[in-house]
Amino acid sequence: MAILVVAEHTNAALAAATLNTVAAAQAIGGDIHVLVAGSGCSAAAEAAAKIAGVTKVLVADNAAFAHQLPENVAPLIAELGAGYSHILAAATTNGKNFLPRVAAQLDVDQISEIISVESPDTFKRPIYAGNAIATVQSLSLIHI
């Protein structure tokens, strides 16, 4: 079981949110691969390689990925992600932009803004503006 973590970065540096996402991947268990898609993003890729628990870093360095536009990034993630059991990204503007597209392209459900990993297919997430916590189980082959 391998997990694809989509790195949140500024091309020059990795965002702290990526570390939180890797921690969630560690809670799931399995090999953790980090995708760094950007333009001139070698520094972010090097930082991703130094994160404890990361077994592989995939780099997509192209001008088309410079601004993390979901129209460009989502097809890349969907193509790469088809071979993974989980695809994770931080609940940031970028993650919220491209993950729904990735889920649609792979024809699987998306579980948004998890706060806890209970098992590889069961997660906790806030509902009702954070006033309640729902436990959600996914039967999809790829968990997003």
For every predicted segment, state its role.
Residues 1-142:
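N-terminal glycine-rich FAD/FM-binding segment characteristic of electron-transfer flavoproteins
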